[in-house]
Amino acid sequence: MKKILAIVSSPRKGGNSELLVDEFIKGAREAGHDVEKVCLREKKIAPCLACEACLRNGGTCVQKDDMAEVLPKLMEADVIVLSTPVYYYSVCAQLKAMIDRSLPIGADGGKMRDKEFYFITTAADDPAAMERTMNDLQGYVDCIPGSVVKGKIYGQAFAAGEIRGKSAMGEAYELGRRC
């Protein structure tokens, strides 16, 4: 059994990326895995100040917000699912803030290592256009020693709920079941 952390970064509740994450979770739970879902829209996570205090004081950020509860979850997970709607060919602001604020556990080979990652992106454009966003996510994984990307889902949809009935839903379920 793996411990899975599913990060939903969309600011829109019930949006397409969250629907895909829910399918991934369904498959993973049916396979017997322990899954926790974290919705960043429900968290107060300020942007990184780049003060590097966390690198000097054992990994504690000077900002007192919800990132303090997200960091341990990232470290404890065996598998991390990162989902984002594509905004201007990149990740949404909520996910970018979380990524930047994970410096205390990822810097210089820090405390986070050997994770399996799955990426879920959604956009109205075709999968080729989402590749830039996937590259952004890959950059994060490249900073975490021993970590690998095990799967990617390109959800082509725009309006909330439009992803229902599309092949990406089945792909998300199957990736969750096989992880």
Task: Please identify what each model-predicted range represents.
Residues F158:
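Active-site rim beta-loop-alpha module in soluble metabolic enzymes
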Residues S9, L40, T122-A124, G155:
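Cofactor-binding loop segments of dinucleotide-utilizing enzymes, especially the Rossmann-like FAD-
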Residues M1-D108, V148-V149, G161-C179:
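N-terminal beta1-alpha1-beta2 submodule of the flavodoxin-like/Rossmannoid cofactor-binding fold
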Residues A93-Q94, A107-G151:
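Short, glycine-/small-residue-rich phosphate/pyrophosphate-handling segment
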Residues Y87-Y89, Y118, Y140, Y154, ...:
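Sequence-level detector for tyrosine residue identity
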